[in-house]
């Protein structure tokens, strides 16, 4: 995993996986694998899958997709098991982005404030590189 700063203020964990380093063949396959890990987790709950590619494409001239990107989806989930203060809802739920390119997948997420949730997402993402 590498750490990057998106727009100079958002800490993101990201893993690029060359397609020959995984048995998964599409963004949907990866989303389904991570969803199965969420379903098996004692706290995490699956919320939705957002087809970011389809949404952006539907915007016509108002949308822009890099020619490198073949598919882009976000899996939305939540690890919240406590609400100690009102502003905690601002950092939830979590989103794991899966982008398919010609020769690789890029899987990324905004760093989580909860260290256990963050480590769990790192392990889920790393498990995609399974060859």
Predicted regions and their residues:
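Short, surface-exposed coil-to-beta transition loops
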Residues: 90-94
């Amino acid at each position: 995993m590498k750490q990057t700063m998106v727009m100079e203020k958002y800490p993101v964990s990201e893993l690029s996986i060359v397609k020959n380093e995984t048995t998964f063949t599409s963004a949907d396959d990866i989303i389904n694998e991570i969803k199965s890990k969420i379903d098996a987790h004692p706290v995490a709950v699956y919320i939705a899958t957002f087809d970011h590619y389809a949404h952006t494409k539907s915007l016509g001239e108002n949308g822009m997709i890099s020619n490198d990107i073949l598919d882009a989806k976000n899996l939305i989930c939540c690890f919240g098991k406590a609400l100690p203060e009102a502003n905690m809802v601002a950092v939830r739920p979590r989103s794991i982005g899966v982008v398919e390119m010609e020769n690789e997948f890029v899987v990324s997420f905004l760093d989580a404030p909860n260290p256990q949730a963050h480590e769990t997402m790192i392990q889920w993402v790393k498990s995609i590189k399974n060859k």
